[in-house]
């Protein structure tokens, strides 16, 4: 069975779509998965916005991950939950899509994306335009069959503590993974939101050992992805405590390919209530 629209697709119904302007969709998290990280909730919002922008451009272009000014982690999504996805687009043209969005579970926000910008690429370079059009029509009509997603393969990294609130590590993009069949069929690329989730795990020890805690991750600011990550690519990971100010703190985390930075973000922390 093909992994397309199964291994990394997180919109299974479009409830309404004013193409290129606003969209409301939903996604039911399968009961069978062990977890559904908040990074994948953010992915769901982005995919919902992408559907509206692709339809507005007659499926000749599609967006890829670029910049998110603010990602807020407001809650948790569990297996069996139904995500309601909302996105408002302020731009959808051949150059880029700009949008903000939110995911809800039972009228409670789980994640918010603010001021996101995704560059557009030619659809035919990454996927079959007609196949994506048919997928959109299915979502807009009866919706896709639920429970197609079976979880994401574990992705490992090597990490060493550098001292003084710093950490270094290395990560190799898998050579093979089911999600490459969905992201994307014609040009496999490691998803930016999986890198986001990896970064949060990478700096987990920095958060635990940070003075003034215990701390909770409440979001990420200035999230930037500068280049594609093909199968087998080796990335260096770097994390460093940025600021500790009262009940708030932040950690800078980035990845590099050689001497060139390929992604960066500021992880925002808030002191946990005891």
PLM feature segments, named:
Residues 49-86, 111-112, 117-118, 200-238, ...:
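Hydrophobic beta-strand-centered segment that forms part of the acyl-chain substrate-binding groove
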Residues 99-100:
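Short beta-alpha junctions and helix-cap segments that line functional grooves
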Residues 33, 37-51, 185-188:
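Compact, glycine-rich, soluble single-domain proteins
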Residues 85, 103-104:
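Soluble ligand-binding/transfer domains with enclosed cavities or grooves
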């Amino acid at each position: 069975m093909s992994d397309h629209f199964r291994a990394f697709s997180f919109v299974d119904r479009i409830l309404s779509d004013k193409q290129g302007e606003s969209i409301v969709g939903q996604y039911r998290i399968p009961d069978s998965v062990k977890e559904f990280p908040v990074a994948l909730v953010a992915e769901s919002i982005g995919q919902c916005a992408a559907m509206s922008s692709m339809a507005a451009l007659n499926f000749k272009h599609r967006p890829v991950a670029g910049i998110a000014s603010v990602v807020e982690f407001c809650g948790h999504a569990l297996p069996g939950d139904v995500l309601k996805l909302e996105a408002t687009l302020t731009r959808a043209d051949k150059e880029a899509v700009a949008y903000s969005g939110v995911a809800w579970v039972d009228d409670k926000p789980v994640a918010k994306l603010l001021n996101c910008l995704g560059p557009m690429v030619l659809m035919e370079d990454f996927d079959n335009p007609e196949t994506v059009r048919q997928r959109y029509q299915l979502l807009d009509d009866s919706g896709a069959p639920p429970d197609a997603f079976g979880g994401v393969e574990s992705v490992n990294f090597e990490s060493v503590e550098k001292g003084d609130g710093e950490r270094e590590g290395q990560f190799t993009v898998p050579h093979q993974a089911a999600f490459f069949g969905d992201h994307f069929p014609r040009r496999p690329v490691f998803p930016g939101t999986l890198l986001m989730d990896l970064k949060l795990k990478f700096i987990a020890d920095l958060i635990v050992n940070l003075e003034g805690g215990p701390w909770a991750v409440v979001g990420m600011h200035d999230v930037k992805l500068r280049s594609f990550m093909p199968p087998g690519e080796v990335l260096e990971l770097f994390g460093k405590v940025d600021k500790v100010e009262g009940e708030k703190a932040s950690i800078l985390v980035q990845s590099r390919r050689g001497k060139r930075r390929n992604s960066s973000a500021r992880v925002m922390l808030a002191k946990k209530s005891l």
